[in-house]
C-alpha cells in the first residue's frame, strides 16, 4: 500500500540550542489532570466490559468529565472538607448490544472511584467527593466500525502531533513531578500532595523550576515541619535534575507562601488537591498526550483522555505520532529533533492518513537522504500496525496525560 508520507528537512535551530524554552507539567492531582485521569479510567473500564461481554470494543466517548471545586478548611495536623468536590462523568456509551443490556454507568462509577482511591489516597470518597454519572446512549449501529475485521474509519477530519526526543528541560520537568510522588512521598515525606505543578524555564544554560505542591495537613505537624519539608523537597529536586542535565538548575517550591510577620499563608490542603478549595477541572485543559505542555514545540490542542481508542483520531493520532517520533529518533541516526503530524480524513481508513508529515532537524553534516528513507520505513510500519495503539491503550501501556 502506498501512503502519503512526507519527510522534510526542517531548517530550524534544535530545541537544545534555542535561547529560551518553556515546559509545564500538571501533576496527577491537579484538577485538570484528575478530570483527564477519570475520563481515561472510565473509557478503559468500558473497553474491558465491552470486550468481556460482546467480544469487541463498542462505541463510547467519555472525554467531557467536569470537576466543580469544593470548599475546605486545611490546618496543620488535619483539617476538613466543608463542601465536597462534585465530579460529573459525562459522555456517550453503548448500553445495549444485540438485545443485551450493558451497565455502562455502573462500570463508569466503579472505575472512577477506584481511580480516585488509587491516585489521591487522602481523599475520603464518603465525605470529600461526590461522583455523578450522566452517560448518553451511543449507537450500536456503529458496531461495524468497531470490529477487528478491518481497519476502522476515521471519525473526523483532525490531526495528531508528536515530537522526540524530550529535551533536557522536558525530562527534568516530567520526572520532577513523577519522582516527588512515586519516590520521595512514599519513602520520606508523606505530606507531599498529588496536586503538583512544575513550570520550567531555560534561558541558555540556566534552568529555573517553579513548583506548586499542595501539602497534606494531616502529615504536616506545624510551620517548622512545613518549611523543613519544602527544603528537603528542594534538595531532592536539584539532585534529581543532575540525572538529566549538566546545566545550572534552581528551584522554588510554593513561591507564594508568606510566613514572615506572623502571616501563615501556605499551600496546605486536606486531601492533596486544590480541587477541594476553589480550583475546577476539565478534560483536555492540562498536559498533552506526552504528559507535558510544551509551547516551544508543535502541539495539538485536542483532548486525548476518554476518547474511544478505536477510531477517534483525537486520541489515536496524538498517541501514534508520539510513538512514531520516538521510534524515528531511536532507529535513525543523526536526528536532533523530529516533529510528526498526522492528518486524517473523515470516513477514510485510519491507516491511510491524508498526510503523515515528519519534519526532521538533522545533526550537522548528516546524510539527509538516509534519514529520509529510514524515517519513512518507521512511519509506514506504524501505520501498517496502527491497531497496536488500541491494544496498548486498553492494556494501560500508554498514558494520555
From Swiss-Prot:
* Name this protein carries in UniProt: S-adenosylmethionine synthase
Q: Would you say which domain of life the source belongs to? A: Archaea
Pfam families per the UniProt record, alphabetical? AdoMet_Synthase
Q: What class of enzyme is it?
A: transferase
Task: State any single GO MF term.
Answer: ATP binding
Q: Which gene encodes it?
A: mat
Instruction: Record the organism.
Output: Methanococcoides burtonii (strain DSM 6242 / NBRC 107633 / OCM 468 / ACE-M)
The catalytic activity, as recorded, is: L-methionine + ATP + H2O = S-adenosyl-L-methionine + phosphate + diphosphate
> Which EC number applies?
2.5.1.6
User: What InterPro entries does this protein map onto?
Assistant: AdoMet_synthase_2_family, AdoMet_synthase_3, S-AdoMet_synthetase_arc
Going by the UniProt record, its keywords in alphabetical order are:
ATP-binding, Magnesium, Nucleotide-binding, One-carbon metabolism, Transferase
Q: In which pathway does it act?
A: Amino-acid biosynthesis; S-adenosyl-L-methionine biosynthesis; S-adenosyl-L-methionine from L-methionine: step 1/1
Q: Does the keyword ATP-binding apply?
A: yes
Q: Which amino acid positions bind ATP, per UniProt? A: 136-141
Q: Which cofactor does it need?
A: Mg(2+)
Family label: Belongs to the AdoMet synthase 2 family.
> Region Disordered: start and end of each range?
278-305
Amino acid at each position: 500500500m502506498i501512503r502519503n508520507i512526507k519527510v522534510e528537512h526542517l531548517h530550524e535551530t534544535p530545541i537544545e540550542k534555542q535561547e529560551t524554552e518553556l515546559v509545564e507539567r500538571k501533576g496527577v492531582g491537579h484538577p485538570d489532570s484528575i478530570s483527564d485521569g477519570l475520563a481515561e479510567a472510565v473509557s478503559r473500564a468500558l473497553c474491558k466490559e465491552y470486550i468481556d461481554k460482546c467480544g469487541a470494543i463498542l462505541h463510547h466517548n467519555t472525554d467531557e468529565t467536569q470537576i466543580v471545586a469544593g470548599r475546605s478548611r486545611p490546618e496543620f495536623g488535619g483539617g476538613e472538607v466543608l463542601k465536597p468536590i462534585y465530579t460529573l462523568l459525562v459522555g456517550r456509551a453503548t448500553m445495549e448490544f444485540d438485545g443485551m443490556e450493558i451497565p455502562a454507568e455502573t462500570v463508569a462509577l466503579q472505575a472512577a472511584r477506584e481511580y480516585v482511591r488509587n491516585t489521591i489516597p487522602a481523599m475520603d470518597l464518603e465525605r470529600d467527593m461526590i461522583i455523578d454519572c450522566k452517560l448518553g446512549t451511543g449507537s450500536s449501529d456503529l458496531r461495524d466500525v468497531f470490529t477487528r475485521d478491518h481497519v476502522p474509519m476515521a471519525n473526523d477530519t483532525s490531526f495528531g502531533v508528536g515530537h522526540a526526543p524530550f529535551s533536557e528541560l522536558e525530562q527534568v520537568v516530567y520526572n520532577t513531578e513523577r519522582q516527588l510522588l512515586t519516590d520521595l512521598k512514599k519513602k520520606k515525606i508523606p505530606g507531599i500532595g498529588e496536586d503538583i505543578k512544575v513550570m520550567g524555564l531555560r534561558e541558555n544554560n540556566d534552568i529555573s523550576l517553579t513548583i506548586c505542591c499542595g501539602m497534606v495537613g494531616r502529615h504536616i505537624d506545624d510551620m517548622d515541619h512545613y518549611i523543613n519539608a519544602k527544603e528537603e523537597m528542594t534538595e531532592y529536586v536539584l539532585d534529581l535534575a543532575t540525572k538529566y542535565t549538566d546545566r545550572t538548575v534552581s528551584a522554588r517550591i510554593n513561591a507564594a507562601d508568606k510566613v514572615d510577620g506572623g502571616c501563615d499563608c501556605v499551600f496546605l490542603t486536606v486531601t492533596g488537591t486544590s480541587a477541594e478549595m476553589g480550583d475546577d477541572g476539565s478534560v483536555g485543559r492540562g498536559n498533552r498526550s506526552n504528559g507535558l505542555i510544551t509551547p516551544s514545540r508543535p502541539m495539538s490542542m485536542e483532548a486525548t483522555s476518554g476518547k474511544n481508542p478505536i477510531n477517534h483520531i483525537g486520541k489515536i493520532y496524538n498517541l501514534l505520532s508520539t510513538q512514531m517520533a520516538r521510534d524515528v529518533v531511536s532507529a535513525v541516526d543523526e536526528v536532533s529533533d523530529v516533529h510528526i503530524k498526522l492528518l486524517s480524513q473523515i470516513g477514510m481508513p485510519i491507516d491511510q492518513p491524508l498526510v503523515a508529515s515528519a519534519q526532521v532537524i538533522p545533526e550537522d553534516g548528516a546524510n539527509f537522504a538516509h534519514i529520509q528513507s529510514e524515517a519513512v520505513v518507521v512511519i509506514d510500519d506504524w501505520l501498517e500496525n496502527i491497531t497496536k495503539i488500541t491494544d496498548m491503550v486498553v492494556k494501560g501501556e500508554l498514558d494520555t496525560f
